[in-house]
């Protein structure tokens, strides 16, 4: 999650495929007003993802309508009915996060009605990877998260996920670090060439 004007400046310079604003928890959380101000300075060609945990459709809709976010990422206990409601009401793509500890978790994620699934270790934000061998023959686009950093960026990219979702692995002392951001993106882009 991006929280400071410098994070936005770096993202605009480095051009990731997505940028995120966290609207849940304590770490990296931004208010609606903070996110709106940050979004104004983010390159309009970079879609902003709003990260939510068991939030209301009304709150998500307010952020979509304001142009603060273009994609909704759900990290709570949201079921397929909520995923359908978000997609149909807000007309934006939905990413649903799943904690992966077993092959059954992967199968459950694969059956989600979300546009994309995000596969993570635990509740997210732990800095730990799950066992990537569990991915096996996953047959749908997925975001890979959990424990990603510049040191394992190439190995993660080699799994051919739709996207990599990195946060704590590009931070120093809990804040985004431009050099780590740059290194992570350079390694992923070099691999994909």
Question: What function would you assign to each model-found segment?
Answer:
Residues 1-193:
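Conserved N-terminal beta1-alpha1 strand-loop-helix module at the mouth
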């Amino acid at each position: 999650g991006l929280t400071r004007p410098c994070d936005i400046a770096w993202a605009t310079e480095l051009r990731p495929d997505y940028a995120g604003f966290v609207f849940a928890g304590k770490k990296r959380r931004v208010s609606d007003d903070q996110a709106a101000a940050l979004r104004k300075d983010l390159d309009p060609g970079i879609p902003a993802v709003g990260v939510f945990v068991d939030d209301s459709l009304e709150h998500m809709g307010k952020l979509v309508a304001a142009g603060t976010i273009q994609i909704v990422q759900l990290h709570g206990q949201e079921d397929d009915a909520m995923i359908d409601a978000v997609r149909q009401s807000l007309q934006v793509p939905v990413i649903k996060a799943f904690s992966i500890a077993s092959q059954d978790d992967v199968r459950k994620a694969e059956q989600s009605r979300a546009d994309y699934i995000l596969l993570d270790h635990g509740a997210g934000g732990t800095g730990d990877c799950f066992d990537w061998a569990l991915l096996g023959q996953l047959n749908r686009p997925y975001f890979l998260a959990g424990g990603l950093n510049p040191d394992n960026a190439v190995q993660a990219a080699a799994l051919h996920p739709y996207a990599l979702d990195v946060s704590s692995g590009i931070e120093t002392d809990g804040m985004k670090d431009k050099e780590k951001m740059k290194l992570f993106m350079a390694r992923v882009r070099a691999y994909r060439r």
